[in-house]
Amino acid sequence: LIFPATLNSLFQTADDYYRNERIVTFLRLIRYVAAFLALALPGLYVAAATFHPQLLPGNLIRSMAEARSGVPFPTAAEVLLMELSFELLREAGLRMPGPAGNTIGIVGGLIVGQAAVSANLVSPITVTVAALTALGSFSIPNEELSEVFRLWKYGILLLGSCFGILGVMLGCFLLLMLMAEQESYGIPWLYPYVGGNLNERADEKDSMFLAAARKRKRRPIFAKWGNRIRFRRKS
């Protein structure tokens, strides 16, 4: 079967519809937050540490300065080094057979991060940022979407290291504009956040927030036009 693919559908999983709608709503919010971390956290960290330290609490600035003492690389190079290391570990884990492949990504990341900190190549907070970014990308349900966010992460990191917070915002807006232009079989890729009235706004009840089953009386827009009513009253 071939259906339109939308951003909203790529954040949904099959087991969402076997759980309580409040739990599903919470988990979907976590996925969206994780996607944002996977996309923008490295750029935000570099921008805040390099251009806008006044945005951070004083105690955090002092901790970051103490942690970075002795590190020979600038902040952007630190983050790029750790991100590429995690990408290498991820790729190695995919190529290794059996349970060892699942283990190398987590254990290898901890070992490499600790070794880099001990050698004063990176600071501990940079390892933390890279680990949170990796966890965010793992939390995206769709692997292809996760790869897109991982690729755009480097563009936003470059913009953040050159232009600060403004560069991060510019990168996010460019990605949003590209997504808004896309369509899948005539359906906007940002549906139902864009063009939600195509199905009488029924799909908004199954988006970032999942409404109760009794309120979702219409099937998604992907269903056949004459078969979009889930519940019909007996005549």
Language model regions located:
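Cytosolic regulatory modules rich in charged/polar residues
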Residues: L1-E78, L145, S184-A212, W225-K234
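Hydrophobic alpha-helical transmembrane segments of membrane transport and translocation systems
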Residues: T126, A130-S235
